[in-house]
Regions:
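Disulfide-stabilized cysteine-rich extracellular repeat microdomains
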Residues: 9, 16, 25, 46-47, ...
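Residue-level signature of beta-propeller blades and closely related beta-rich strand-turn architectures
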Residues: 33-34, 45, 99-100, 111
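A short helix->beta-strand "capping" segment at the edge of beta-propeller domains
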Residues: 4-12, 67-69, 135-140
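Short glycine-/Asp-/Thr-/Trp-enriched loop segments that recur within the blades
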Residues: 3, 14-16, 76-81, 144-152
Length: 167
């Protein structure tokens, strides 16, 4: 009793998942997509927590279809980031990304109380543009003064409305 057994559907992700994290009504995973580890998120997306520049939910159709899933747009100088680590809070997500030898943090979703670390309460990932967009519009979180505050993060943990890192 209470077991899902053979009745549980598998998600059709674009590659093998190496990590998974869940927030309130949504899930994100690091997926090997054609040899590059990228972030993919699905579920509730009312404040941009899926990082897809809109507020449309993903994967809420019948049969677990993921046909509308796209990777989170994390780039630097037109080069896609390699996602090293990812963690979801209640309604925001932060990831350690790798660009060459650098390992900065990028966050998206609910910006209330400064939980994303960008010095504002703006939500990120809700639409295209310099304030709430992804890709080249999504900067790194400044964790301390100088360049080392951007580039040498080793671990990350997101809570309901907070995010902590180890540098």
């Amino acid at each position: 009793a209470g077991e899902m057994g053979d009745n549980l559907n598998f998600l059709d992700l674009p590659g093998s998942a190496s990590a998974i994290t869940a927030g309130d009504g949504f899930t994100c995973s690091i997926v090997d997509d054609s040899g590059t580890d990228k972030a993919f998120c699905w579920g509730l997306n009312d404040i941009g927590q899926l990082g897809i520049e809109n507020t449309n939910n993903v994967g809420d159709g019948s049969g677990g279809s993921m046909s509308s899933i796209n990777n989170v747009d994390l780039v630097y100088s037109s080069q896609p980031a390699v996602v090293q680590s990812i963690d979801a809070g209640e309604d925001h997500v932060c990831a350690i990304v790798q660009y060459g030898s650098y390992r900065p943090v990028q966050c998206w979703g609910n910006g209330a109380d400064g939980r994303l670390g960008y010095g504002s309460q703006d939500n990120r990932g809700t639409g295209a543009g310099s304030t709430n967009g992804m890709g080249s519009n999504l900067g790194y979180v400044r964790l301390s003064s100088g360049t080392t505050g951007y580039y040498h993060v080793t671990d990350i943990e997101a809570g309901a409305g907070t995010t902590c890192v180890i540098m």
